[in-house]
Amino acid sequence: MSRIVNVKLSLKRYEYEKPFHITGSVSSESRNVEVEIVLESGVKGYGEASPSFRVNGERVEALLAIENAVREMITGIDVRNYARIFEITDRLFGFPSLKAAVQFATLDALSQELGTQVCYLLGGKRDEIETDKTVGIDTVENRVKEAKKIFEEGFRVIKIKVGENLKEDIEAVEEIAKVTRGAKYIVDANMGYTQKEAVEFARAVYQKGIDIAVYEQPVRREDIEGLKFVRFHSPFPVAADESARTKFDVMRLVKEEAVDYVNIKLMKSGISDALAIVEIAESSGLKLMIGCMGESSLGINQSVHFALGTGAFEFHDLDSHLMLKEEVFRGKFIQDGPRMRVKDQ
């Protein structure tokens, strides 16, 4: 009764509450692919892919075009053999977000068959996590207003997007710190700086007495030497995001001693590689945060359960659904301000 009898993909569009601006990109909507896995028992498991051309080279149209191929890959397999399904979907090399969605939908269906939740299948290490909330690139004045609003909403970790104007970025962080005292800051350049600019930014902020908890992806993804340079010349811990898409990327980063943190995103790695990265981190002393692309509440649900289950993360950047207009909340978790916890069955 636990065998897969059908797999369906469908396009979903979500409008942002306001345009979301990061280095080199402004988004007004998120176009995602919803995955539905149907079992012979009638149980349905759900996942969501939020493809990024900028990070993964994925297009929504390409994901939808391989619906039949994905269906053929896993139809007839019992979801209790989820490791087998993971192994098969690892072959979706060019479609990491779809791989993540199919793998989670498999676990979602299995958890329903077993009368439990995905976070418990993954270990059940934590009952609650706390997310940050993001300030996109804007004028200094607007960034400060947004950060103050986020702080007043109860968020104590604030993510600040930078990378397009060094002088304004330094000023924005300084002014944000004045109105959000007691908050922790994750600063994300999204590959926007050169090595020299990245170090200049970090030192300027440090000299103003501002502490940054995580300095994320300051340089280009392929510039591993640059990440290492910034790490050893910056007063703040450096994280890889775009440079860390697969477990093999992370192994190289560890070998090169290039970063202090890696930002796991299921949309980059799928569940299978994400689990491997957790093991690599635990073995090497690498610290972890977990992030997102443009997922709705259905997609963020995947990362929330992964984080609750593994308990592997120091920081949680799971706020994309808070920026989108959704008619119905579809996460199997309770959102209480920044806190996210398991929803009772």
UniProtKB/Swiss-Prot annotation:
Biological role stated in the UniProt entry: Catalyzes the epimerization of L-Ala-D-Glu to L-Ala-L-Glu and has probably a role in the metabolism of the murein peptide, of which L-Ala-D-Glu is a component. Is also able to catalyze the reverse reaction and the epimerization of a broad range of other dipeptides; is most efficient with L-Ala-D/L-Phe, L-Ala-D/L-Tyr, and L-Ala-D/L-His.
Signal peptide residues on this chain, from the entry's feature table: none
Protein name: L-Ala-D/L-Glu epimerase
Alphabetized SMART domains for the sequence: MR_MLE
Cofactor note (record): Binds 1 Mg(2+) ion per subunit.
Involved pathway(s): Cell wall degradation; peptidoglycan degradation
Cross-referenced SUPFAM superfamilies: Enolase C-terminal domain-like (SSF51604), Enolase N-terminal domain-like (SSF54826)
UniProt keyword terms in alphabetical order: Cell wall biogenesis/degradation, Isomerase, Magnesium, Metal-binding
EC code(s) of this entry: 5.1.1.20
GO molecular function annotations of the record: L-Ala-D/L-Glu epimerase activity; metal ion binding; racemase and epimerase activity; racemase and epimerase activity, acting on amino acids and derivatives
Source organism per UniProt: Thermotoga maritima (strain ATCC 43589 / DSM 3109 / JCM 10099 / NBRC 100826 / MSB8)
Requisite cofactors: Mg(2+)
GO terms (BP aspect): cell wall macromolecule catabolic process; cell wall organization; peptide metabolic process
Family: Belongs to the mandelate racemase/muconate lactonizing enzyme family.
Catalytic activity: L-alanyl-L-glutamate = L-alanyl-D-glutamate
Catalytic residues in the record: K161, K265
CDD domains xrefs: L-Ala-DL-Glu_epimerase
Binding site for substrate: T134, K159, N190, C292, D317, D319
List of residues binding Mg(2+): D188, E216, D241
